[in-house]
């Protein structure tokens, strides 16, 4: 019942379905049962949750035995992460599957929405469920893979915006999965799709697994290419934003924007899940490496312009991985802070969504706008940073706008660079 699972449960309950959510965190469950949003930033969640909790249409528990037996459908939205060697770590997902399977009763549909390497639903989880439950897939229960395709902060809108992909282990199981999602979801009309928006059967779990990995890996590869263009543009004194704008003026070019980091639970992780099945995919691995190096590159640009960062006061603006979302998963802040520490800078971090104590929990000193600083590096595109001026950062000698969110007109007379801006001001 996290940032994806809770909105999903709320959406189902708002559609008239009886929903029980399971999570290992009792504090989160207590908040949900009390109608209190456990985490900020999800549009409409604070509005939708209270009446559902008070009516009992949605309730939360830490006990699988209180939720799984007799369920028509079980939707798994448990995190799958990568370890220090960038290999999929199935520990949490395996444990959740075992706990669920121990209470599974005949007739239930099990849908995995967590992004998985190709072949995992059929090769790992269907056999595991059979082993623990003693039931037989395709006879006593059905398993499908149906990837979540939503973005935190706008889950309710995204559920209606994008087709729901469903892949089963057999034809009848897939049909059942399609019927389930047609019953719990509704869709926006879109004339830009090759077929009507709605639930799209994929002909197998593997196709659905690959579709999710392919769409997210494409984004990482595209951003990696944009970042490569940006680094060359910096070296050549070219504004890459104008180049990309020109390229994208014809229909065959869709170059993404370069930036200081690619963060979040999805885009930095899912290429690794793809590579788990296709380790020879050199384009994918090269793009992932290029994107992972961008925080250090941004710091190196500052060091090159100033001669050295040794002893300088540097404020990193933005702990979150993206603007407006209180989440640090794979945020570029970690790479930026690490590179600054290696350069000998005095580092502090600012984020409008985090308190001083929350920043301190990461081991960072908090920076407050208005305090003296030598260098500022924008890492997250928070809306409040768009209006930043040198007056907000007294003494600033250089702004590295890693997200290109500030207005150049507000920085006239103070050195400001962007990723791929091709600018080399005198500091």
Give residue ranges: language-model regions.
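Structural/interface elements that position substrates and couple domains in central-metabolism enzymes
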Residues: 1-427
């Amino acid at each position: 019942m996290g940032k994806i699972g809770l909105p999903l449960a709320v959406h189902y309950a708002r559609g008239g379905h009886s929903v029980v959510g399971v999570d290992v965190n009792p504090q989160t469950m207590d908040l949900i049962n009390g109608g209190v949003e456990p985490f900020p930033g999800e549009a409409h969640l604070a509005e939708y949750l209270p009446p559902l909790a008070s009516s009992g249409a949605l309730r939360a528990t830490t006990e699988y035995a209180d939720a799984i037996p007799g369920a028509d459908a079980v939707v798994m939205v448990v995190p799958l992460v990568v370890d220090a060697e960038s290999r999929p770590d199935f520990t949490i997902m395996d444990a959740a599957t075992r706990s669920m399977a121990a209470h599974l009763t005949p007739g239930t549909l099990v849908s995995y929405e967590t992004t998985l390497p190709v072949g995992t639903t059929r090769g790992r989880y269907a056999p595991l469920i059979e082993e623990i439950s003693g039931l037989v897939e395709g006879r006593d229960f059905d398993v499908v893979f149906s990837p979540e395709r939503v973005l935190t902060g706008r889950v309710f809108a995204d559920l209606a915006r994008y087709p729901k992909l469903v892949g089963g282990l057999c034809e009848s199981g897939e049909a059942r999965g399609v019927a389930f999602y047609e019953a719990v979801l509704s869709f926006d009309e879109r004339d830009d799709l090759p077929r009507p928006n709605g639930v799209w059967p994929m002909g197998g779990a593997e196709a659905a697994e690959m579709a999710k990995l392919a769409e997210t890996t494409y984004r990482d590869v595209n951003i990696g290419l944009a970042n490569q263009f940006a680094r060359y543009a910096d070296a050549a004194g070219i504004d890459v934003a104008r180049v990309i704008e020109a390229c994208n003026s014809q229909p065959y070019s869709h170059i993404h924007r370069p930036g200081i980091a690619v963060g979040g639970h999805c885009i930095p992780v899912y290429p690794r899940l793809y590579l788990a099945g296709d380790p020879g995919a050199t384009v994918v691995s090269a793009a992932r490496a290029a994107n992972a190096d961008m925080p250090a590159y941004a710091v190196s640009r500052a060091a090159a312009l100033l001669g050295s960062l040794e002893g300088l006061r540097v404020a990193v603006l933005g702990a979150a991985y993206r603007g407006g979302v209180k989440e640090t998963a794979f945020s570029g802040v970690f790479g930026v802070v690490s590179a600054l520490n290696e350069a000998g800078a005095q580092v502090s971090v600012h984020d409008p969504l985090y308190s001083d104590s929350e920043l301190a929990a990461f081991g960072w000193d908090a920076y407050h706008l208005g305090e003296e600083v030598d260098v500022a590096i924008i890492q997250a595109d928070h809306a409040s940073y768009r209006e930043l001026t040198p007056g907000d950062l007294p003494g600033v000698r250089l702004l590295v706008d890693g997200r290109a969110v500030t207005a150049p007109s507000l920085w006239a007379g103070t050195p400001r660079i962007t990723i791929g801006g091709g600018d080399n001001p005198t500091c």
